[in-house]
C-alpha cells in the first residue's frame, strides 16, 4: 500500500503569538505571503484539506503563527500575512518582529514557501521577507499564485522576469501556481516533501 503523502496528514497543532511560546523544534516548512496573496488557499490545496488554513475576505486577519502537525517529526507552519494597510502600526510592528525572528532563529526550519500574487510579484515586503531569510542559507520556493488570472503569454513573461530578477539567489526557486485551477500543485508538493524528508522525496515528473 502506498504511504499517504506527508502533506495530506496535516492537522492543527497549536497557535502562538510570541516567540517564546513556539513548540519544541521539529523539521518544518513555513508558508509566508502578503495578505490576500492566496497563502491559506495554497495550504488548503496542498494538504487536500479545504478548511485547514483559515481564509478570510479581510486580509491581515490571521495574526498568529499556526502550526500544523504532519508527522511526529514534522510541522507545516502558517505565518501571519503581512503588508495589509489597515492593520494598526503597533500590530504591524509586532508581526514583523515575530516573523523576522522566527525566520532567522528557528533552527529546525527546513525552508520557506513564499506566496506572491503573480499579478504583483516582488513587492517591497516580499523582498523584505527574502532579505530576512537569506542569512540562513536555507531554500525558498516561490509560488506565483493566482496564475489562472493571467494569459499564457503573461504567465511565461512573469515567470521569466521573476527568475531573472532572482537569478543571483542560488537558494531561491520559482514556479507558477493556482489554487483554483490546481496548476503547479504537484510540483510544489514534491518540493516541500523533499525538504521535510529528503530520503523519501518523490521525483518530480518529467
UniProtKB/Swiss-Prot annotation:
Gene Ontology BP, a term: division septum assembly
Question: Does this entry carry the keyword Phosphoprotein?
Answer: no
Instruction: Tell me where on the tree of life, at the top rank, the source sits.
Output: Bacteria
- CDD domains attached here? YihA_EngB
Q: Which gene encodes it?
A: engB
Its function, per the record, reads: Necessary for normal cell division and for the maintenance of normal septation.
Which keywords accompany this UniProt record? Cell cycle, Cell division, GTP-binding, Magnesium, Metal-binding, Nucleotide-binding, Septation
The UniProt record gives the binding positions of Mg(2+) as: 40, 62
Q: What is this protein called?
A: Probable GTP-binding protein EngB
Gene Ontology annotations for the cellular component aspect, listed alphabetically: cytosol
What InterPro entries does the record tag this protein with?
A: G_ENGB_dom, GTP-bd, GTP-bd_ribosome_bio_YsxC, P-loop_NTPase
Cross-referenced Gene3D superfamilies, in alphabetical order? P-loop containing nucleotide triphosphate hydrolases (3.40.50.300)
- Annotated source species: Thiobacillus denitrificans (strain ATCC 25259 / T1)
Molecular function (GO) terms for this protein are:
GTP binding; metal ion binding
The EngB-type G domain covers 25-198
